[in-house]
Amino acid sequence: MTRRVRLGVDTGGTFTDVVAVHEDTGDLAVTKTPSTPSDPAVGFMTGLHKVLDTLGLGGDAVSGVSHGTTVATNRLLEGRVENLGFVTNDGYEFLLEIARQSVPDGYGNSYFWVKPDRIVPVDRVRTVRGRLAVDGSEIHPFDLDQATEQARWFRDRGIDTIGVCFLHSYVDDSHERAMRDVLAREHPGATVSISSEVLREYREYERAVTTLVDAAVKPDLRRYVATIATRLSQLAVGQEGGGSPPGTHPGPSTAGTTPSVRSESPLPFYVMKSNGGVLSAGEVVDQPISTVLSGPAAGALGAAVVAAAAGFSQVVTLDGGGTSTDVTVVVDGQPALTTEGTIGAFPCKVPMIDVVTVGAGGGSIAWLSPEGTLKVGPRSAAADPGPVCYARGGVEPTVTDAHVVLGRIPPHLLGGEVPLDVASAAGAIDALASELGLTRDACAAGVLEVSAWNQANALRQVTVERGLDVRDFTMVTFGGSGSLLACRLVDVLGLDGVLVPVNPGNLSAYGLLTVDVRNDYVQTAVARASTLDPAVVRAGYDALTERAAEALAREGFPSDRRVFERTADLRYFGQAYEVRVAVPEGAVTEELLASVADAFHDEHRALYGYDNRADPRQEVEWVSLRVSGIGPLRTPSVPEASVGGGARSASTGSRKVYFDDWVDADLFDRRLLGAGDEITGPAVVEEFSSTLPLHPGFTARVDAYGNLVVRRCAS
């Protein structure tokens, strides 16, 4: 059979979402299956077989698989970074302890702040003599004997995951490579990451932590990707059986090695990266740090693609899950990027889509603060035991319980697969209401109001920090709980409207199929604009472009299918932060450098409200050069929807729903709605993986692509 179906598989903490796209027709098929945190490969393969069974196809029909995984993220968020060691310069053993000497926002009095545990305790930090100057020249030679001694120290104590970060190795990596060679000789079973390969950028604290995060997640990610790659290879040739039953393992893997990842396979397998691109499994195992936010990145990209097709180039996205809500901003069809992200308590300076996360998901717990006020989140009931209405042992009221009590979601989820216990949810809300002195309805409505404001604050944060006005944006909501508070957010934020895509609960999996192969490269090269030599800048970009080209060649992209994008980090001399600006194509000349400086002034004003263009004393300083290498993949177009026959044909009845009061709300099956159909609230639009409560005074119109466009009525 000709391979014509591409699959996107997004593994979340609760569900694994799968989207299948036929490359010729653009037809979509979607499904969900419970995730299997103890062995994520089981849920992955079960979901894959489920969608293929729906289509009546076998593995020989699959042309490629793109995957978003939480393996790396979960290891960090759960604090599972044990058995990790660190090697740095002699005299810098307290680099991680000192960190940035800063206290997080919200702790005005530092006496109340408890410093979190460092990623590596100081007793597992070893130092080696040897020192490079800021320009890469050698001040003291690398001490091979001491390096050997330290490698044996790690080996004798069974510390087999090690990060190496030496000062100024972003300029000259010879000392770090020498340390890796010593570790390979003396401790051959160790997994090693060196900072000059993970992050070739200055600021040693962030570079060290990013390198250690890379090392910490590398063993798990390698084993996981190797297992999936082996199963996909078997599937492609018809040797793989059905999805493994729960509790079983899909096959053996070898710690620290990835033979099945590196081997040739008839089925291309890509893994989503945090920067908005994908990378083949064989390459991504050497860049595990790049996958830490792959799930939220895929959702933001999928939302950007759907919004662009619908005619919206500027949107904010809201991905509502069970534990949290992720928001980001899309300008001119591109999600915003950052290198200032954090994963849990750990700074990660690799490029990633800028996502703000707030603990306001469907499972977020409502509670009474010591001050007597109602709070929602960040603590969550998660999937186990889950909200009270799941009847799995949960006793604390959650956002989902409030929705159930107010009739805003049906008494079942996933098309009836998950029945909900409305009475138990009401009991949990009643208990909280009695503490607050409120009625059940007022308490449940209050829980949703607090949750809506938590989400609104995150949306303001992601826009205002960039000098943007959230009122200029349309919001795209997706995820299982993403659309539940859409109408309230329109009022709170003054939004123009909301776009609810087709299959919103599977949009992250769809987003996996809309992206290209992408690698990012950086080189710190600090110089003031007045002394900047175009030849030096040209040489720097040429070296980065060569590295990007080599990586694309390994991915199988010929020279005529490689795209390169240049950017630079600039600042005013004396500042401690940079602004990234695009560097146009073409020869690096004085004129081009001047145009980049002009763009920096404009961007600085947009972000901070001022620039120093007219003040010659405020000199522009170049800090880092960046190149992104992009290999375009075939991506699906957004299919158009069939014309509807009127919203009444999709009506399934009515029920009492509480908005500002109890009202009769019409119910609609979204599968039966077509382009041009329009619904006026109060109403509830239900589908397999999501629900949209449409408040009184709002309309929802189905556009040409099947999206629901929600706006407040003109009157």
Protein language model features and the residues they cover:
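Charge-patterned, long linear interaction tracts outside catalytic cores
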Residues: 232, 266-309, 546-587
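Short beta-strand-loop/turn "lid" adjacent to the catalytic site in phosphate-handling enzymes
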Residues: 20, 28-32, 59-102, 167-176, ...
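Glycine-rich beta-strand-to-loop/alpha-helix junction loops that act as flexible
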Residues: 69, 163-167, 195-197, 274-275, ...
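Conserved phosphate-binding loops in N-terminal lobes of ATP-dependent enzymes
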Residues: 8-11, 15-19, 27-30, 34-43, ...
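N-terminal glycine/serine-rich phosphate-binding loop of ATP-dependent small-molecule kinases
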Residues: 1-84, 140-162, 176-181, 185-195, ...
